[in-house]
Design a protein with these regions (language model features):
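Short, low-complexity N-terminal intrinsically disordered segments enriched in polar/charged residues
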Residues: 1-18, 22, 26
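Short beta-strand edge/turn micro-motifs at domain boundaries
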Residues: 90-108
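A short gly/proline-enriched turn/hairpin at secondary-structure junctions
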Residues: 32-42
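Short beta-edge strand/loop motif at the mouth of beta-sheet-based domains
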Residues: 41-49
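Surface-exposed, charged secondary-structure patches
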Residues: 48-92
Length: 108
């Protein structure tokens, strides 16, 4: 069954499964915030660096399997596999979207 993800969220997951940090950053608003592993990354440049650093640290793939909530604030569950401690794991991605860009993303 295909999930009905907002286009920018679909693009985020596609980009996150590559080594292209520019593609990841392009999904976000200029002043966006990402919270991952209890750290905040503010703005596109920091998000680009986060995307790059994440790929240098681990190899992983995220596969969304559930989405809830309104289209401007989707909550997505994804199965993540890779070479990180605790592999595999199901994570929750909480998005806030503004004007077809990701304004906030919290991963946990």
């Amino acid at each position: 069954m295909a999930l009905n993800l907002p286009p920018v969220v679909s693009e985020y997951f596609a980009a996150a499964n590559t080594d292209d940090a520019d593609r990841i950053a392009a999904c976000f608003a200029a002043d966006a915030n990402v919270n991952d592993e209890k750290r905040d990354f503010l703005g596109r440049d920091a998000i680009r660096q986060w995307g790059s650093d994440s790929r240098k640290k681990y190899t992983f793939q995220s596969e969304p399997f559930e989405v809830e909530g309104p289209s401007q604030a989707p909550v997505v569950r994804a199965h993540v596999t890779g070479d990180f401690p605790g592999n595999p794991v199901d994570l929750t991605y909480r998005f806030t979207l503004v004007k077809n860009e990701i304004a906030t993303l919290s991963i946990g």
